[in-house]
Amino acid sequence: SYPMKLVSLDSSRFAMVWTDANTYYVKVVVGTVSGSSITFGSTVVVESYNASGYVEIDKVAANKIVITYMTWGGPGGTGLPKLSVGTISGSSISMGSAITWPYVTNGNKLEAVSYNSTEDKILVVAPGTDNATNRAKFVAAGTVSGNNITFGSLVQISTQAEEGYYFKAVYDSTTN
């Protein structure tokens, strides 16, 4: 089975994303907590083509999320990292079209996504871009506008991460 990821939207709602182990579709749903009960809106398919299983999610605003995932079938049968922006209204969610990660990743997944509300940017952590740097880690800042994301340059943040270890991104508002 594949891990589910959750993000809090407000004091009573959250979004949950996962890859369905039977269909290999990436799916998302909004949950609402009331007392000790949880109700869910309709499940929405984010990606219906051969997803790899590992997903990340973060909130961009009270009504907007970004999901990262990967599909198989890129060049040479490698993975193709993708992102999708979703807009939430109550317990409903509407997903934009898939955005292909604009940099080569050697078929590796995007490892983390985090939103910086002060700068109004998302940060995405990605693996190396070629065989020489495939264990190095990089980060790129992106601007979300509607259902689109525009990315700046990749910046290397480590040179030799061990295989099997993944980075997480968290914004700290107390530092620059």
What are these regions (language model features)?
Residues 1-176:
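Extracellular, repeat-based ectodomains that mediate carbohydrate processing or recognition
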